[in-house]
């Protein structure tokens, strides 16, 4: 258990750990990923609280600072995955061509637009939704990664990370984390049903994205997981900001 938690923090954050993340990524690390997400959620919630205290409730600057800290704390890994995935989905050709675009590493117009829109929406939604909602949104993003690695989901050809994590998560693990984050979302909004509904909707949208990527690329990659995380976080943040 300790090694899985250590691996989750090494994989998902900039925190120094005894073992390199690349040597530990697997079933246990993915199962523990929402725990690392909870730590990131606490960090993000704290930054938003401090920013709101300094600049006023609903300040866009507080939201921007929160997003910036999350980017630094995760090395920008997930937003880079979103960029590469959107560029790959935007190209024509067979799966091999799309995967080549994904692995090229050069941000195209689709990817740049997706990153800009995501960061803008997250910043504004975080500012409006409050610190508790930010915590839920960040954790939900990590739960989406667990769900994307459930059994039956293949890895794309040539994907190192995809081969390590695809199909490693029993469905009950993904379901358990989903129920946990949905339950935690109950007191976040004035309407008790809103939080769980938003979490379910965000995870459903993520599942749809992953399913489309499996059809387009033949399976998942590390970039697809990053895209699923960012999409889930963004949708959850927006939904929880609705009054």
Curated annotation (Swiss-Prot):
Belongs to the CobS family. Its cofactor is Mg(2+). GO terms for cellular component: plasma membrane. The keyword Metal-binding does not apply. InterPro entries: CobS (IPR003805). It is an enzyme of class 2 (transferase). GO terms for biological process: cobalamin biosynthetic process. This is Adenosylcobinamide-GDP ribazoletransferase. The gene is cobS. Its EC number is 2.7.8.26. It comes from the Bacteria. GO terms for molecular function: adenosylcobinamide-GDP ribazoletransferase activity; cobalamin 5'-phosphate synthase activity. It catalyses: alpha-ribazole + adenosylcob(III)inamide-GDP = adenosylcob(III)alamin + GMP + H(+); alpha-ribazole 5'-phosphate + adenosylcob(III)inamide-GDP = adenosylcob(III)alamin 5'-phosphate + GMP + H(+). The chain crosses the membrane at residues 29-49, 53-73, 119-139, 170-190, 194-214, 222-242. It is a multi-pass membrane protein. Joins adenosylcobinamide-GDP and alpha-ribazole to generate adenosylcobalamin (Ado-cobalamin). Also synthesizes adenosylcobalamin 5'-phosphate from adenosylcobinamide-GDP and alpha-ribazole 5'-phosphate. Keywords: Cell membrane, Cobalamin biosynthesis, Magnesium, Membrane, Transferase, Transmembrane, Transmembrane helix. Its main location: membrane. Pathway: Cofactor biosynthesis; adenosylcobalamin biosynthesis; adenosylcobalamin from cob(II)yrinate a,c-diamide: step 7/7. It holds the Pfam family CobS. It is found in: Cell membrane. HAMAP family: CobS.
């Amino acid at each position: 258990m300790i090694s899985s938690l250590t691996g989750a923090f090494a994989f998902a954050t900039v925190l120094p750990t005894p073992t390199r993340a690349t040597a530990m990524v697997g079933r246990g690390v993915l199962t523990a990923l929402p725990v690392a997400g909870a730590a990131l959620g606490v960090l993000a919630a704290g930054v938003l609280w401090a920013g709101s205290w300094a600049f006023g409730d609903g300040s866009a600057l507080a939201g921007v600072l929160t997003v910036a800290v999350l980017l630094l704390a995760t090395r920008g890994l997930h937003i880079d995955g979103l960029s590469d995935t959107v560029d790959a989905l935007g190209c024509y050709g067979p799966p091999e061509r799309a995967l080549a675009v994904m692995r090229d590493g050069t941000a195209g117009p689709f990817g740049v637009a997706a990153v800009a829109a995501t960061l803008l929406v997250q910043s504004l939604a975080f500012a409006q939704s409050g610190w508790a909602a930010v915590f839920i949104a960040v954790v939900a993003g990590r739960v989406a990664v667990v769900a994307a690695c459930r059994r039956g989901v293949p890895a794309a050809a040539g994907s190192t990370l995809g081969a390590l994590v695809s199909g490693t998560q029993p469905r009950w693990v993904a379901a358990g984390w989903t129920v946990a984050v949905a339950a935690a979302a109950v007191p976040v909004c004035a309407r008790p049903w809103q939080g769980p509904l938003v979490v379910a909707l965000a995870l459903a949208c993520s599942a749809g994205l992953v399913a489309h990527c499996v059809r387009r690329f033949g399976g998942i990659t590390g970039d697809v997981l990053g895209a699923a995380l960012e999409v889930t976080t963004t949708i959850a943040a927006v939904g929880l900001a609705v009054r």
